[in-house]
Regions:
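An acidic/histidine-cluster motif and surrounding catalytic segment
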Residues: 1-14, 19-200
Length: 200
């Protein structure tokens, strides 16, 4: 579906069918797609964050992507996305330090998804972004809520991210896209590692 849309359009906003969005979600997505259209290091716009850190402003960058409402550009996807067929193909060129970085030193064991057949697209995109030294824009407060997660196949804890609950209210105040450095924030990354600890 993503490739089909990007054959016809320069950008795409993706929503799963069990997602409820903030009233400011679409404005944020469209503004971010426009603002970073020429900043090719920015590869993904996320609507969900498992953090709640308004003290850091309205947005932040991280190498980690999230689904549940996201966007990207044709050039990023077409130039860099690979749907890997095997674990070996996905991890080609990466060393142990890279694997630890992707999995936040074991707090986010996402690479086990490479053993699935077929390999899910999201871990492929995560690795592609990392290999390109790309970053993903996130709001400091979530703009989406997954209203179907409690009935989902993989749901087994209402606090999958430790103290960061999925069912907290989403932000309704418009996002101001200020000119922040296009790089990860070490303090936020440390918080992210804690928030990802219980998600596998």
């Amino acid at each position: 579906g993503i490739a089909y849309v990007l054959e016809r359009h320069d950008t795409i906003i993706v929503l799963e069918d069990d997602i409820c969005t903030s009233p400011v979600f679409l404005e944020y997505m469209n503004n971010a797609l426009e603002k970073y259209a020429l900043s090719t290091q920015v590869m993904h716009i996320a609507g969900f964050t498992n953090l709640d850190i308004p003290q850091f402003g309205d947005t932040y960058f991280t190498p980690h992507m999230t689904g549940w409402g996201w966007a990207t550009w044709k050039d990023r996807w077409n130039n860099h996305f690979t749907h890997f067929k095997t674990r070996e193909e996905a991890l080609q060129g990466l060393i142990d330090k890279d694997l630890k970085r992707i999995e936040y030193n074991g707090n986010f064991t996402c690479l086990k998804s490479l053993d699935k057949n077929p390999i899910p697209w999201d871990i492929c995109w995560e690795i592609c972004i990392y290999k390109q030294k790309g970053v993903c824009l996130h709001p400091t407060q979530t703009l989406v809520k997954n209203v179907g997660i409690s009935n989902g196949t993989h749901f087994n804890n209402n606090k999958l991210f430790g103290w960061y609950e999925y069912d907290r209210p989403f932000r309704t105040k418009p996002i101001i896209l200020k000119d922040i450095p296009i790089e990860e924030n070490p303090t936020i990354e440390a918080m992210y590692a804690i928030a990802l600890k219980d998600h596998g």
